[in-house]
Curated annotation (Swiss-Prot):
GO cellular component: endoplasmic reticulum membrane; mitochondrial outer membrane
Listed GO biological process terms: autophagy of mitochondrion; regulation of autophagy
Protein's UniProt keywords contain Disulfide bond: no
Gene that encodes the chain: cisd2b
Annotated TM spans: 38-60
Membrane side Lumenal: residue ranges: 1-37
Protein name per the record: CDGSH iron-sulfur domain-containing protein 2B
Protein family according to the UniProt entry: Belongs to the CISD protein family. CISD2 subfamily.
Keywords of this entry: 2Fe-2S, Autophagy, Endoplasmic reticulum, Iron, Iron-sulfur, Membrane, Metal-binding, Mitochondrion, Mitochondrion outer membrane, Transmembrane, Transmembrane helix
Topology of the protein relative to the lipid bilayer: Single-pass membrane protein
Localization annotation: Endoplasmic reticulum membrane; Mitochondrion outer membrane
Amino acid sequence: MVLETISKIIKTQLPAYLKKFPLPETIGGFARLTVLDWLRLLPLLGILALLGYLTIRPFLPKKKKQKDSLINLKIQKENPKVVNEIDIEDLKSTNVCYCRCWRSKTFPVCDKSHIKHNELTGDNVGPLILKKKIL
């Protein structure tokens, strides 16, 4: 079924399309084409543009990977790592660390991704540590 459809397209529909194809013999002939002729040319021009792009794409410059940017721009820049500890009475577990670098795989819980981030960027961001307040 699929092969019959492809065969019909190649053997009958493609030659019929190419017979009606308004390809002028000279460059100046393109100026005399009607709107209907240009509409008939669009599929071929689209395919040629796609093939041209796919041909030159390997030679185009690759996008440079954007360097990780700083998160902490001005808070406690004199400290090697900014970590805040907060005591909370109603906390169910003893310690909870929350990520502030937005790189954690277990976000919002900190997985120490800030260490690699700090090494790469020179930043000093650290986790937010919530401790259970002992009365």
